[in-house]
């Protein structure tokens, strides 16, 4: 194709099989029982897109399709006998545009469309889902204006979503920056957000919650960034307020499902840095935050106060690789803050080889040291996992 045109595509596939303890103590809902369940999930996704770009204009059109088949069943039976089966399909279209008016001004805008579908052969405990669960469309329109010179930067954007299930929601963001000294800048941002529950949140067998409401948010950020002694760094203070925040929590029967936790606030500070040591490039970050349920004044469950990350990357001829370390501090496994989960750190390794200009083969090992830890009470994290990816671009 012409040098101003790009055509690209990706395809991905994965299958996951896991076991968990579905036992329950005696309660008002029934006697105690002991049962180990197995989940089987297969996901496929495909994306195709085209991009045009020149010195002033960029336009990109992307289309994607994904499908997921999921089963939940006692490990004494098989997948074919599963009373919980969940077949979802998702179609998306996205059109993005930007035009550079002059050295200072850039305008952008676009549209996107998403259709979520639940196959009518899906079942939860052997029961079909309500007809309103089978299909949902969301159409979004957005626009952006940016200004920037050597001293000042500013941005204003707006978005309108028309969700077939939850109605229309309008959100916007604005920000400004001041480069008060060469290599140092002070910035501030404010924005509103809207997130509809996914089909998995609403209807996934054994854990979906069809009563979920959309999540709405307001975010405030104050940033100072600069470059000192060869290190590019950024210090950010933020406050995020949520209405009907969606979070995993136990229901009245002790089963973990997505829940609206009401009003929540997360305040924090994050320090990020980028630097090089010889042929290695590094990205590091450290964060401290206070995630709070405003109704109870308790720490939000499953969200830690402390976190850190380090990623080191290298490239040599057709080879590239990265080694990363992720740390999450202690957090609570319940809304009452009575059960504490320990902190953990995980290493990941990735390598890639550019076979040809259009072909690349990559491999990744997650949880390299096979660390044992829990993501929530009674749910151990994945063991060491291996991934292979083949990318092709025209």
Regions found by a protein language model. Give the residues of each.
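Membrane-embedded beta-strand positions of outer-membrane beta-barrel proteins
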Residues: 9-11, 61-63, 107-111, 156, ...
